[in-house]
Amino acid sequence: IRNGVVTGLETDYIAPGIGRELSKGILPKPIIFRTHGSRPADILSGHSLIDIAFIAAPASDSMGNCSGKYGPSACGSLGYAFADAMKAKKVVVITDHLMDYPLTDASITEDYVDYVVNVPAIGDPLGIVSGTTRMPKDPIALKIAHRPSMLPVC
């Protein structure tokens, strides 16, 4: 950000540490907040443009056919990354489980991938949590979190 490589952000959440820095006006473009679910639609419609997408894939072959079903970091569907892969100018698949070519039941196919990077581990599953999925500790946030359970089901 300080070097001008990142000039704007589109997100559904910002952690407090980076939020404090961003609130000082260090980005030349405004931050766009949107719901988690509307992100793929905005990408596919061309409203949100992606220069480069880094897709963490639990398994990939050397050409970029990748899946979330295999490997030590298996997580299930990579569906949330479809829009990124389809619309980004460049796509980098990062994996910790390189499989033989071709990975035939890929979620994202090589047609959309420019580069594949094999790393020792794509992440620590225990550390993958955001402020939106972490249980709140303060009384007001707990009260807000509890409220939806009080709504009648029709």
Enumerate the language-model features and the residues they cover.
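Conserved alpha/beta enzyme-core scaffold
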Residues: 1-154
